[in-house]
Design a protein with these regions (language model features):
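N-terminal mitochondrial targeting presequences
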Residues: 24, 32-42
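Flexible, glycine-rich terminal cap/loop adjacent to redox cofactors
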Residues: 52-57, 61-78, 90, 94-95, ...
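FAD-site-proximal beta/loop scaffold in flavoenzymes
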Residues: 196-213, 308-390
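Catalytic nucleophile loop
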Residues: 58, 222-225
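Short hydrophobic core segments
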Residues: 50-52, 161, 174-184, 218-219, ...
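Glycine-rich flavin
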Residues: 44-47, 56, 63-70, 75-212, ...
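Gly/Ala-rich phosphate-binding loop of Rossmann-like dinucleotide-binding domains
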Residues: 62, 66, 229, 233-234
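N-terminal chloroplast transit peptides
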Residues: 1-28
Length: 525
């Protein structure tokens, strides 16, 4: 089956217009005329690999493709870096870094314990300056990505590829032997919510930091909502979480979530409503008219409360950006927009369900958020590398259980593998015994020196084999500490082996050393 893809090109920075003079296929990529010194290795195609989308996943695939000597074209949609670089991971870390400094400088009790005296009333910040820091960082990283593609000889085309069943409508073409779909995702806005990106906004609008509201409601208490609650409270806002589930942070390990609630919510100007839907959210006017939020019980659907706040941030997750890509027209069924793929990232014709047998679509791959395997930037990059490995004939599948994740609050939260609740179910189903060991920041010399000794690390392991199943951490620099654990899961390293590895003293890594040693009955120094 031959697939064709038309290309929407950028008419201006802010406007996309459809151009039918271009298409892409596994088999063929048609684009507005451009010249290239690259050509496919077999001479039959202009490019070995065509990548639709240039977020972290598409960029990672492109780098590895060129590293393997494959001629590569990337159709960026005018959005090199994608969500992560332009509207997500990168600029949000800039906001967290700046607001975190403000929080630290206003924490006079903590500073005085270190022998530092600061007048909290004299600590000021520039909203515009913090917003500029985030924007400048995003632009800098985006430029680095663009330069890396150019330096390696990738053909970067501004435009978004779409599968089409009618190649006769297009004119100029460049052919590609294999095609990788990497369109990413967009914020999910629930029914009844009106977004004006001024007083009611998604994470896209929040990153611009247009104003710092006195009172902001955050709808959803996952990674995104937690991180922005950290930013807002540090800058002086009061926050109300609105969560549909019965508990805050419903996807987190419950023990970690309870500690997070104590450290990140109860000690701050934050309150919350759980078990309710924001059934209707109406924008306001800053300083003039409040945002109105009507809430209903998640079970009974009865109205329970109406809130009037200065702003509302919608942090209810993300959905795949696969609309209008021509998937349905080519007979490719999605599951709520997610493209079904096998372990090798190869696109299948439909989701697995009773009565349907997915067929492999030759030469077509889908990576990152759009396939729904794991909606993380570094997972998308791993998908891209894996797809190229399989294109090169080297069978490869990503081990998602070994991919770490982090929430960059103060203190940070990180994890790899299933939650304890999920691990208990796995052990019962598969017939093995789950072990658990913990390390504490409270007795860690480095954490005590910093005056930030709240937190813990929890190691879950298979008692029969000693293999690490999962690790969950909350505490200072948890996002950096988790990588050692992810490596252990990926390599199949046992707690017996980990307990004998020497950790630098005094460092935060000794929190993990304590947990590893505890797993085998040893005491840590």
């Amino acid at each position: 089956m031959k697939l064709y893809v038309s290309l929407r090109t950028l008419a201006s920075v802010s406007t996309l217009v459809v151009a039918t003079s271009a298409f892409v296929s596994p088999g063929s990529v048609k684009v507005p005329s451009f010249s290239s010194s690259l050509s496919a290795s077999d001479g039959e195609f202009d490019f070995d690999v065509a990548i639709i989308g240039c977020g972290v996943g598409g960029h990672g695939a492109a780098l590895h493709s060129r590293g393997q000597g494959l001629s590569t074209a990337v159709f960026s949609g005018g959005d090199v870096g994608g969500t992560c670089v332009n509207r997500g991971c990168v600029p949000s870390k800039a906001l967290l870094a700046a607001s975190g400094r403000v929080r630290d400088m206003k924490d006079t009790a903590h500073l005085e314990s270190l022998g530092i005296q600061v007048d909290a009333a004299s600590v000021n910040y520039s909203r515009e300056g913090i917003a500029a820091h985030a924007k400048n960082l995003a632009n800098r990283v985006k430029g680095n990505l663009e330069n890396s593609l150019i330096a390696l000889g990738c053909e970067v085309v501004e435009g978004r590829g779409m599968l089409t069943a009618n190649p006769q409508e297009v004119k100029d073409e460049a052919t590609g032997k294999d095609v990788i779909l990497a369109p990413g995702s967009i914020p999910f806005v629930p029914p009844g919510v009106t977004v004006d990106e001024k007083t009611v906004y998604t994470s896209d609008g929040a990153l611009e930091l247009g104003f710092v509201p006195e009172w902001v409601a955050i709808i959803g208490s996952g990674y995104i909502g937690l991180e922005f609650s950290d930013v807002y409270t540090a800058l002086g806002s009061e926050v109300t979480f609105i969560e549909a589930m019965d508990t805050l942070m419903p996807t987190f390990d419950r023990e970690i979530a309870k500690q997070a609630e104590r450290l990140l919510i109860r000690d701050r100007p934050i309150d919350f409503r759980t078990g309710v839907f924001a059934s209707e959210v109406t924008p306001g006017i800053p300083g003039v008219k409040p945002v109105t939020i009507k809430m209903i019980d998640a079970k009974t659907k009865e109205h329970v409360e109406t809130l009037e706040v200065d702003a509302a941030m919608i942090a209810t997750g993300r959905v795949p950006n696969t609309a209008n890509m021509g998937l349905v027209e080519r007979g490719i069924e999605t599951n709520r927009g997610f493209v079904n793929v096998n372990g090798k990232m190869q696109v299948l014709s439909c989701p697995e369900a009773e009565g349907s047998v997915p067929e492999l679509i030759p030469n077509l791959y889908c990576i990152g958020d759009a396939n729904g395997k794991m909606m993380l930037a570094h997972a998308a990059s791993a998908h891209g590398i894996s797809a190229i490995e399989n294109i090169c004939g080297r069978s490869h599948e990503v081990n998602h259980n070994a991919i770490p994740a982090a929430c960059f609050t103060h203190p940070e939260i990180s994890m790899v593998g299933p939650t304890e609740e999920q691990a208990i179910e796995m052990a019962e189903k598969e017939g093995w015994t789950l072990g658990k060991s913990q390390g504490s920041f409270r007795a860690n010399s480095k954490a005590l020196a910093e005056g930030e000794s709240a937190g813990m690390a929890k190691v879950l392991f298979n008692k029969e084999t000693g293999n690490v199943v999962a690790v969950h951490i909350i505490g200072l620099h948890a996002a950096d500490l988790i990588q050692e654990c992810a490596n252990a899961v990926a390599a199949g390293t046992t707690v017996q082996e980990l307990s004998m590895i020497v950790h630098t003293h005094p460092t935060l890594s000794e929190v993990l050393d304590e947990a590893f040693k505890g797993a085998v009955g040893m005491s840590a120094h």
